[in-house]
Amino acid sequence: MAVYTEVPDEALAAFLADYDIGGLLSYKGIAEGVENTNFYLHTTVGSYILTLYEKRVAEGDLPFFLGLMEHLAARGLACPQPIRNRAGTALGRLCGRPAVIVSFLDGVSVRRPGVRHCRALGRALAGLHAAGVDFPMRRPNALSVAAWRPLFAQAEAQADRVAPNLAARTRDDLARLEEAWPRDLPGGVIHADLFTDNVFFIGDAVSGLIDFYFACTDAFAYDLAICLNAWCFELDGSFNRTKGQAMIAAYQAARPLDPREVESLPLLARGAALRFMLTRLVDWLNVPPGALVKPKDPLEYDRKLAFHRRVTGAEEYGWTP
């Protein structure tokens, strides 16, 4: 279970006493998630999620994340809404960790999304980008192209233990992407981690977007490229162009891509794949003793990179004029 900080009953009761969310009926740890400690709270008023932020989330970034969720929820986006305590603040402390209570969202994530899920996700992503346009805070993307070489430096010496010639392939990718990375594309608030486990569905409709703790200010099309990587590859490693076409078309129905974004899509998709390969690779090589959470396989994204290197245009992802 992904519960890194144990919370005694007495400490939890004292923390909840500062909130107008009713009396606690039950609570349990949530196994999903690898970054933070999460609990499901059931009270006499309703259901909530309690999150304790572990070391990987910088406390100084929390006002951005929490402010963004409040902003998006106020504009009708289905996302967790931070609950403020009686003092009027959303951010508290519990067991030495920054802690927040947010609203509970109904729905389930899908492990193997179909075309209809990809279409709904494209529509929801465009809605997120539109809702965040007037959000006043900014947060640079700490895991964009400038961060990839320092990340690789942490793993380069051991990379070929994970897969033959992985280090050489990664050096080539870095050189190409650093040279050609697109700048000044249309941008604003992006989610930057909208994998299938961060999207809830009821039927074929998106019922909620969660886990905004990589959200930042960057190119909108990069967020779309992350989603193409996360949603449109099959288990055999092939890219499903039908899913890509559904996602891109639904996104474009709300926010048409401009010609620069279309031209840049292959590089953005390759860069997105490299970003997740590198963070997974570093985690894979640095599993702490006794870890309860298995790190994600970096080679899944090494295989996706092999596809992106061959792509010559956005049409291969399903974009149509």
Swiss-Prot record:
Q: Which GO terms describe its molecular function?
A: ATP binding; homoserine kinase activity
Q: In which pathway does it act?
A: Amino-acid biosynthesis; L-threonine biosynthesis; L-threonine from L-aspartate: step 4/5
Keywords (alphabetical) are: Amino-acid biosynthesis, ATP-binding, Kinase, Nucleotide-binding, Threonine biosynthesis, Transferase
A single Gene Ontology biological process assigned to it is: threonine biosynthetic process
**Catalyses which reaction(s):** L-homoserine + ATP = O-phospho-L-homoserine + ADP + H(+)
Q: What is its EC number?
A: 2.7.1.39
Q: Which Pfam families match?
A: APH (PF01636)
Where in the sequence is the signal peptide annotated? none
Stored InterPro entries: Aminoglycoside_PTrfase (IPR002575), Homoserine_kinase_II (IPR005280), Kinase-like_dom_sf (IPR011009), Pseudomonas-type_ThrB (IPR050249)
Origin: domain of life: Bacteria
Q: Which family does it belong to?
A: Belongs to the pseudomonas-type ThrB family.
**Classification via HAMAP family:** Homoser_kinase_2
Q: What is this protein called?
A: Homoserine kinase
